[in-house]
Amino acid sequence: MKAHRRHIREKIVQALYTLDVRDTDTATAGDWLITPEISKDPKAIRFFKQLLGAIVDNREEIDQYISKHTFNWDMSRIAIIDKNILRMAMAEILYFEDIPPKVSINEAIEIAKKFNSTDKSSKFVNGILDAVYNDLNKSGKINKCGRGLIDQSSNLKKNKEKSPSDDQ
């Protein structure tokens, strides 16, 4: 049976939670949560390890992006689950060129609904990720390649701003 990415993302959030509340290393936290479904699928295990590694290796940078958009919230006050859902989505947006940002944001919202640390978790996660995405998009820091990965509305807007004389 093929492991679904949502299942993998949920396990990533759980591994990050484990790292926050227990004295353990990344490999151990990840190994505890790799299900047989994930371990039998080479693509799934690779995605799991790459995503978890990207979050752990770039946590400081990811947290800076999140902090910049949590105006009245100190990072220490954000629920651990919500913080780790945000970190997971941010890692995908920043470091995974093959995953559309809208997919990362939607997956984070759905996972926030499932884990539901508060009754407003999904709205909080949506608001922060939307603000970060818009900021990154405006500053040209979204680096996505492949068909369907770039927000088409951004491309249309850029093309409309370009005058016909620019092509000559």
Swiss-Prot record:
Write out the GO biological process terms: DNA-templated transcription termination; transcription antitermination
Q: Tell me the GO molecular function terms.
A: RNA binding
The protein depicted here goes by the name Transcription antitermination protein NusB
Quote the PANTHER family the UniProt record gives. Answer: ANTITERMINATION NUSB DOMAIN-CONTAINING PROTEIN, N UTILIZATION SUBSTANCE PROTEIN B-RELATED
Q: Where is the signal peptide?
A: none
InterPro entries assigned:
NusB-like_sf, NusB_fam, NusB_RsmB_TIM44
Role description:
Involved in transcription antitermination. Required for transcription of ribosomal RNA (rRNA) genes. Binds specifically to the boxA antiterminator sequence of the ribosomal RNA (rrn) operons.
Family affiliation: Belongs to the NusB family.
What's one Pfam family the UniProt record gives for this protein? Answer: NusB
- Which superkingdom, per the lineage? Bacteria
Q: Is the keyword Cell inner membrane assigned to this protein?
A: no
Q: Does the keyword RNA-binding apply?
A: yes
Cellular component per GO, a single term: cytosol
Q: List the disulfide bonds.
A: none
